[in-house]
Regions:
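Short linear motifs at protein or domain termini
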Residues: 1-37, 41, 45, 151-161
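Short N-terminal alpha-helical targeting/association segments
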Residues: 19, 63-65, 112
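Short helix-capping and inter-helix turn/linker motifs at the boundaries of alpha-helical repeat units
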Residues: 44, 111-114
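C-terminal effector-binding regulatory domain of bacterial HTH transcription factors
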Residues: 133-161
Length: 161
């Protein structure tokens, strides 16, 4: 049977916004736990990843950040670094891929890749300082900014769900 086991999941705009609100809390928790549990080497690797992302943005005038899975890599490393297996499974499962699909379609938003990189750097600084509370706050604000960006795109008709 062709496509056996392949499931296509679609969501309404309101469901997508609900998923972002759930992600905001879950990714905030992942960032808090990453600050408490990541090794120094993992944090150094995360910082190096952002340096690579910055070069990619510069080379592509900001358009390649998500296309090269840079954003996914950042969030994946933090989810894994939280050492919370269930949380990481939830964040990196089917729903996460669906959310990524919409994020990818929005990655060409003017200035968003540069802003996202700055937000990522501040999150990593908080993790490196082992400040779980600040890392959680910054991650939640980062996901909330992404949600607001998507909401605006839907309202302006630039993104159809």
């Amino acid at each position: 049977r062709p496509h056996a086991g392949v499931k296509v999941v679609s969501v309404s705009a309101s469901e997508l916004m609900e998923l972002y609100r759930i992600r905001e809390v879950m990714e905030g928790l992942a960032a808090r736990q990453a600050a408490e549990r990541m090794t120094d080497q993992e944090i150094a690797d995360l910082q190096a990843t952002l340096d690579t992302h910055e070069r990619m943005i510069d080379e592509a005038q900001g358009q390649a950040y998500y296309q090269a899975e840079g954003d996914y890599d950042f969030h994946h490393r933090i989810a894994t670094g939280s050492r919370n297996t269930k949380l990481a499974q939830m964040l990196l499962g089917d729903l996460y891929y669906m959310v990524r699909m919409y994020r990818y379609r929005l990655s060409t938003s003017t200035g968003r890749p540069q802003r996202a990189l700055g937000e990522h750097r501040r999150i990593v600084e908080a993790i490196a300082q082992r400040d779980g509370e600040l890392a959680e706050f910054l991650m939640k604000r980062h996901i909330n900014a992404a949600r607001q960006n998507i909401e605006r795109k839907i309202e302006e008709g630039e993104l159809t769900i």
